[in-house]
């Protein structure tokens, strides 16, 4: 039987309607977070797409020392808690160390392990021990079949609900490529799989002191991923991505999101009807 992860009234599974995980790359302040959450909630409600709000309190792996990291865990969790209570929506955010897991789990519904940290055993253990859903991004350096080792670690440490995310693989210097086989291979582990459509177009360190990206390919890759038959799409969204503090070149402009989601719903419906 294929694994389905349940979160409140949302069911996350590779054979079910896709779930949207979206929000700005980092938490920029309470007003901005509430603005983005409200817009995304209204849009996904209108389109009948299950929605999980995402934003990060700390971008701990910025390219340069000059990169803006975010508001930090205390202020960030306070804002995410406000978003959750205001809109009654599930929340996902990143954790970067064992010490962050317990406090973060008090607020959010899903703990996300960043791609660069996907093999860090102590971090996986700490996340699993919270009892929360754990979503792991496959490292850009890791083969999809090697995610079975990540799965085994989490299961040994007690994790019951696991999600895996594809976010591209290293393709030479400052470039990533999306191998759609990865989605099918990770699905064979009986884990719901999510495709990160925005980080997959990232050009790591491509601007010297920061990462670049090719936003124009986000929709194309999202359509391809949905056509495989997956559990969710992850997209970072901003009302003014070119002036966002991080990952602007990859993020989708809020005004363009609706048209993309309408197309993805059609692709998702056809794919799962055929299967």
Swiss-Prot record:
Q: Which SUPFAM superfamilies match?
A: Aldolase
What's the top EC group for this one? transferase
Gene3D superfamilies from the UniProt entry: Aldolase class I
Q: Which reaction does it catalyse?
A: D-arabinose 5-phosphate + phosphoenolpyruvate + H2O = 3-deoxy-alpha-D-manno-2-octulosonate-8-phosphate + phosphate
Principal location class: cytoplasm
InterPro entries in alphabetical order: Aldolase_TIM, DAHP1/KDSA, KDO8P_synthase
Q: Give the molecular function GO annotations.
A: 3-deoxy-8-phosphooctulonate synthase activity
Where is this protein localized, as stated in its record? Cytoplasm
* Pfam families recorded: DAHP_synth_1
Which pathway is this protein engaged in? Carbohydrate biosynthesis; 3-deoxy-D-manno-octulosonate biosynthesis; 3-deoxy-D-manno-octulosonate from D-ribulose 5-phosphate: step 2/3; Bacterial outer membrane biogenesis; lipopolysaccharide biosynthesis
What's the protein called, per UniProt? 2-dehydro-3-deoxyphosphooctonate aldolase
Q: Please state the gene responsible for encoding this protein.
A: kdsA
């Amino acid at each position: 039987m294929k694994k389905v992860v349940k979160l409140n009234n949302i069911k996350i599974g590779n054979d079910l309607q896709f779930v949207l995980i979206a929000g700005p790359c980092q938490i920029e302040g309470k007003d901005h977070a509430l603005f983005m959450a409200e817009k995304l909630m209204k849009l996904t409600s209108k389109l009948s797409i299950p929605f999980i709000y995402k934003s990060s309190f700390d971008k701990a792996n910025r390219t340069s020392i000059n990169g803006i990291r975010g508001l930090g865990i205390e202020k960030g969790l306070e804002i995410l808690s406000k978003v959750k209570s205001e809109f009654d929506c599930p929340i996902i955010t990143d954790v970067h160390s064992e010490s962050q897991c317990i406090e973060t789990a008090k607020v959010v519904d899903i703990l996300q392990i960043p791609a660069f940290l996907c093999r860090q055993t102590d971090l996986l253990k700490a996340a699993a021990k919270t009892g929360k859903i754990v979503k792991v991004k496959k490292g850009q350096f890791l083969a999809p079949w090697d995610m079975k080792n990540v799965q085994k670690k989490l299961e040994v440490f007690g994790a019951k609900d696991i999600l895996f995310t594809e976010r591209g693989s290293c393709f030479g210097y400052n470039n990533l490529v999306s191998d759609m086989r990865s989605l099918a291979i990770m699905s064979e582990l009986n884990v719901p799989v999510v495709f990160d459509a925005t980080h997959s177009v990232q050009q790591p360190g491509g601007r010297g002191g920061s990462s670049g990206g090719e936003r124009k390919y986000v929709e194309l890759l999202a359509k391809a991923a949905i056509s495989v038959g997956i559990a969710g799409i992850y997209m970072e969204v901003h009302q003014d991505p070119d002036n966002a503090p991080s990952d602007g070149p990859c993020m989708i402009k809020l005004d363009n999101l609706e048209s993309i989601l309408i197309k993805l719903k059609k692709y998702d419906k056809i794919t799962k009807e055929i299967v």
